[in-house]
Amino acid sequence: MKNAYYIGLMSGTSMDGVDAVLVDFSGPQPQLICSHTEAIPSHLLKGLQRLCLPGADEINRLGRLDRNVGQLFALAVNNLLAKCNIAKEDIIAIGSHGQTVRHMPNLEVGFTLQIGDPNTIATETGIDVIADFRRKDIALGGQGAPLVPAFHQQTFAEIGKKRIILNIGGIANVTYLPGTSEHVLGFDTGPGNTLIDAWIQHVKSEPFDKNGEWAASGKTNPDLLAQLLSHPYFSLAYPKSTGRELFNQAWLEQQLSPFNHLDEEDIQSTLLDMTCHSIARDVIKLSPEGELFVCGGGAFNTQLMQRLAALLPGYKLDTTSALGVDPKWAEGIAFAWLAMRNHLGLPANLPAVTGASREAVLGGRFSAK
């Protein structure tokens, strides 16, 4: 059978690098052929973080960063192809998520904005790019997120098996696969790594808390935990999605101001528990028992996985490796899959998940010619 090669590009709310994956969709399950992470240069990272919050001269900064991020994504593709020793002519299309700089679906006229100019990516790689996946769903009255549940359904669902796929990036999202003819459900539970990363970056200038070791050295403060979990987002009904617009460094500092007597590691432990408790609450609402498979950066945080398991005794906990998909690359593979769906003219959103009025083909194609 002829190979069906697509490339997926993903940079999430953690902004910890651009993940590039080469995936073959010619078989019954996606096959990861090769992967690469392109580091985000510090000057670009600072520019993106600044753009995620309201500020002056935004349009000029947005335009420049749109091109800069496109160039970085193109570099990630070219380095991936060199690593895999695959010719660009063998790739059907690139699926690029871009970099989210605003996600505001609940305004009177909701919107979401990802940058990383697909014209630049197509021109600098010589490969057609499919991008702008979220805005069709928003135009149909949906949240534009999460989009990965449709991929999870096709890849991980099994009749008779009640499964939850938990993706823990900067924001955490769940996909409920009932194992029956019931609707698949999915939504963002709230912060994943974004606040625990922000705190260790602020205090220790380290990019992330490896294995949750710093959190493990602290003791959770129940009063701070209760305050953090009182955020209105956690009591919203789904469909719902969120991002840095709600959960960011400024919000965290505001929450911490009455607790400045706490040790820094105790705050880290409490932030980790906020992530775990908010996830566990939503998982239990979906089903008190079943199988839970974790992907994303959080799958590699030992302390997070241990605390989550303790909060979910009715669940068998594992990573998506057990289902044949490397948890580090799962979201990149999903965006390669979204590109394939667009190329074939097939819908890729789940209205029961996003709240859109109907299924739709997502994304637009940007030719390399």
Curated annotation (Swiss-Prot):
Keyword field contains Transferase: yes
E.C. no: 2.7.1.170
Positions with a binding annotation for ATP: 12-19
EC category name: transferase
Signal peptide location: none
Keywords, sorted A to Z: ATP-binding, Carbohydrate metabolism, Kinase, Nucleotide-binding, Transferase
GO molecular function: ATP binding; kinase activity; phosphotransferase activity, alcohol group as acceptor
Pfam families: AnmK (PF03702)
Pathway the protein contributes to: Amino-sugar metabolism; 1,6-anhydro-N-acetylmuramate degradation; Cell wall biogenesis; peptidoglycan recycling
Swiss-Prot/TrEMBL catalytic activity: 1,6-anhydro-N-acetyl-beta-muramate + ATP + H2O = N-acetyl-D-muramate 6-phosphate + ADP + H(+)
Annotated GO biological process: 1,6-anhydro-N-acetyl-beta-muramic acid catabolic process; amino sugar metabolic process; peptidoglycan turnover
Family recorded in the similarity comment: Belongs to the anhydro-N-acetylmuramic acid kinase family.
Job of this protein: Catalyzes the specific phosphorylation of 1,6-anhydro-N-acetylmuramic acid (anhMurNAc) with the simultaneous cleavage of the 1,6-anhydro ring, generating MurNAc-6-P. Is required for the utilization of anhMurNAc either imported from the medium or derived from its own cell wall murein, and thus plays a role in cell wall recycling.
Family annotation (HAMAP family): AnhMurNAc_kinase
Name of this protein: Anhydro-N-acetylmuramic acid kinase
Organism for this UniProt entry: Shewanella sp. (strain W3-18-1)
Taxonomic lineage of the native organism: Bacteria, Pseudomonadati, Pseudomonadota, Gammaproteobacteria, Alteromonadales
Protein's gene: anmK
